[in-house]
């Protein structure tokens, strides 16, 4: 994984800021969601300047972690980030935290968050409902799980840890602009194919999804016993059941003394064009 980096200088001190990984991007959204939930649960609590500074320090600490000595000294990334966050809060001025936070946002492509399944606003619609941090986090996490499933990666956290934030955003953009567009095209052409073929083949079991390349219909379940009995009522020879499934219909006199194999051969040969044909 190659992360974008940029030197950040403040008051003569230079550090290296890195683009966040996709996993860090999700963890940052999780922090914002927790803060929003705490604010909703306590009507008297508001998002203060202290919260903004701590959120910025957390974001900067995650960025510094990629090139910080604590990365190899601490057993886990979360513990190392906590140590770096305390270092930022105690040694950095608030102005530097704010500027560095903006750099990390820019490097990671996190100025705009995409929410899955966001309803389109029409001209007659009222003011758009504000997108909460919880909705953004849920949308991003849902997409991350879908992406892991598409890539065959059962551990979605490991997948995101090895992916940059901009790479994750590129996948998000690709699926939003191409994959879902392909789904709409597939629906259109499968429906068109179904309409055309239904004019020539009056098959009640035919379905538009039979012609879909992206969403194949699952195999039909085994027919029930009564359906099998109804189909068996039309067989010539062998054990034959009536439509009610109870009464056994005896074989016709002309084939009563013949074996089952002979009767089956006669049945099949009725449709042969040319050669020996039986009535």
Curated annotation (Swiss-Prot):
It comes from the Viruses. It is found in: Host cytoplasm. Keywords: Host cytoplasm, Late protein, Viral release from host cell, Viral tail assembly. InterPro entries: Phage_tail_T, Tail_assembly_G, Tail_assembly_GT. One of its GO terms (biological process) is viral translational frameshifting. The keyword Lipid metabolism does not apply. GO terms for cellular component: host cell cytoplasm. It holds the Pfam family Phage_TAC_2. Belongs to the lambda-like tail assembly protein family. Promotes tail assembly by creating a scaffold for the tail tube proteins. Tail assembly proteins G and GT probably wrap the linear tape measure protein to create a tail assembly scaffold. This allows the polymerization of the tail tube protein, during which G and GT are released, therefore they are absent in the mature virion. The tail assembly protein GT is produced by a rare -1 ribosomal frameshift. The ratio of translated G/GT is about 20, and this ratio is important for proper tail assembly. Interacts (via C-terminus) with tail tube protein. Interacts (via N-terminus) with the tail assembly protein G and the tape measure protein. This is Tail assembly protein GT. The lineage of its organism: Viruses, Duplodnaviria, Heunggongvirae, Uroviricota, Caudoviricetes.
């Amino acid at each position: 994984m190659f992360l974008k980096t940029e030197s950040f200088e403040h008051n003569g001190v230079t550090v290296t800021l890195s683009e966040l990984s996709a996993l860090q991007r999700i963890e940052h959204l999780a922090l914002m969601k927790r803060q929003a939930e705490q604010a909703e649960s306590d009507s008297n609590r508001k998002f203060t300047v202290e919260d903004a500074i701590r959120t910025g320090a957390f974001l900067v600490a995650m960025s510094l972690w990629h090139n910080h000595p604590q990365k190899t000294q601490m057993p886990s990334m979360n513990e190392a980030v906590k140590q770096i966050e305390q270092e930022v809060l105690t040694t950095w001025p608030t102005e530097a935290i704010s500027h560095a936070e903006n750099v990390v946002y820019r490097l990671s492509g996190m100025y705009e968050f995409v929410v899955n399944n966001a309803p389109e606003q029409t001209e007659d619609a009222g003011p758009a409902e504000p997108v909460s941090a919880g909705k953004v986090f849920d949308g991003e996490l849902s997409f991350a799980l879908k992406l892991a499933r598409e890539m065959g990666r059962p551990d979605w956290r490991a997948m995101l840890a090895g992916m940059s934030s901009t790479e994750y955003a590129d996948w998000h953009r690709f699926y939003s602009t191409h994959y879902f567009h392909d789904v709409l095209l597939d629906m259109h052409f499968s429906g068109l194919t179904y309409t055309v073929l239904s004019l020539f083949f009056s098959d009640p079991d035919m379905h538009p999804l039979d012609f879909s390349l992206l969403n194949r219909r699952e195999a039909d379940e085994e027919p029930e016993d009564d359906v099998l009995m109804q189909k068996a009522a039309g067989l010539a020879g062998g054990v034959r059941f009536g439509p009610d499934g109870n009464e056994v219909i005896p074989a016709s006199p002309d084939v009563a003394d013949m074996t089952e194999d002979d009767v089956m051969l006669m049945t099949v040969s009725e449709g042969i064009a040319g050669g020996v044909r039986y009535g």
